[in-house]
């Protein structure tokens, strides 16, 4: 794998546990600042479903040999620069940073066929430039009823758009036609971003 990555080292990336939506926003911001010509090829991807119960494997917070965890939602970053190359940058995975799309999807999501329908995963894919403009969160979802934090927040101020409204729910929602970007099932997501060996060979001729 080439070493010409958007983010040379995972240690150089902004990261706070349990704030994946903000971690990915910071990745988008970093690309805009350091590699602006690549921003149009980058995406923020939310994974969730109606019941907000999505199993993911190979996660740092996971348990057992397979490191599986059930999240209410998760967010990761995609760089799709070429017809034969698509990379996933996930700050919470135990897979390499980055990982080729096919390997990431195969090991992180496996298949919906063996899962109950209520655990099927859906994906909201948002262009990075759109995400930088429209995402807004006052972090209310991380507070208990008494106002204390479920998990310590990032040290920087909340990310608020010009509307100054908390809209995290619009990104987690997996209803097609609502919210920014496009919503895909797992199979549709793979069809849109997987670069098959045949396509790679054709483009390398």
UniProtKB/Swiss-Prot annotation:
Alphabetical list of InterPro entries matching this protein: N_Gln_amidohydro_ab_roll_sf (IPR037132), NTAQ1 (IPR039733), Prot_N_Gln_amidohydro_ab_roll (IPR023128)
UniProt KW Hydrolase keyword: yes
Family, similarity comment: Belongs to the NTAQ1 family.
EC number(s) per entry: 3.5.1.122
Description of how the protein assembles with itself and partners: Monomer.
Signal peptide: none
UniProt cross-references to Gene3D superfamilies, sorted A to Z: Protein N-terminal glutamine amidohydrolase, alpha beta roll
Role summary: Mediates the side-chain deamidation of N-terminal glutamine residues to glutamate, an important step in N-end rule pathway of protein degradation. Conversion of the resulting N-terminal glutamine to glutamate renders the protein susceptible to arginylation, polyubiquitination and degradation as specified by the N-end rule. Does not act on substrates with internal or C-terminal glutamine and does not act on non-glutamine residues in any position.
Name assigned to this protein: Protein N-terminal glutamine amidohydrolase
Top EC group: hydrolase
